[in-house]
Amino acid sequence: MADKQKIKVLVVDDEPNIVEILKYNLQKEGYEVATAEDGHKAVKTAIKFQPDVILLDIMMPNQDGVETCLQIRQIPELKHAFIIFLTARLEEYSEVAAFDVGADDYITKPIKPRALMSRIAALFRRDSKKEQEKGQIKIRDLNVDRSSYTIDKAGKTITLPKKEFELLYFLANNPNVVYSRDELLHNIWGSDVFVLARTVDVHIRKVREKIGEEY
């Protein structure tokens, strides 16, 4: 994991007490912390602060976390930031919506600071392992480049959120192998993140929509 002194965390929640608790515990662990109380301010702060991790509440007035995540994922300089949703909602569609717009993890309230720190550390561990697997894969006119997280199809650049890219790269790197949903969840999201099997279906559908059904 990278040096915590250099890791920036943006906390976004409309409940001041939650923001203060998370800020206190993150700073105690050595992270640099910025905060925002709504989605609009979160996007502006993220552009200026350039966080490595964004803790994002789903249920916020004016602009919810899902829309905020979608906007952040469209900002090129923030495409590698980890986004962890914080929510009191347990419904399946909330989780699917979260991962559908590019979230990396999903934690329900009340949030236990120690558990949150472990989840953040786990994201960086998985990312570190993937950094060691950089390379390019070419399938007909499709070129998948992990070193730059870019996809080129017949000279046209295709942009995918991080998890969609990781899913495509993993499957392209293991051709002619059939994986179960559980195996894909383990390899892409990791065993320490609880994700519904339906999330895999959503990501595969979105990848196919963007690169074409022929692959």
Task: Label every PLM stretch briefly.
Residues L70-I75, H80-K138:
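Basic, amphipathic DNA-recognition helix from helix-turn-helix-like DNA-binding domains
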Residues M60:
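Receiver (REC) domain active-site loop signature in two-component systems and cognate sites
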Residues E20-K28:
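Charged docking surfaces used in two-component/phosphorelay signaling
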Residues K134, T159, V202-I204, R208-Y215:
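DNA-binding patch around the recognition helix
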Residues I7-K8, A122-V178, D182:
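Short, Lys/Arg-enriched segments at the junction into DNA-binding effector domains
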Residues G30-E37, T45:
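Short hydrophobic/Thr-rich beta-strand motif most characteristic of the beta2 strand and flanking loop
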Residues F49-L55:
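Active-site beta3 strand of CheY-like receiver
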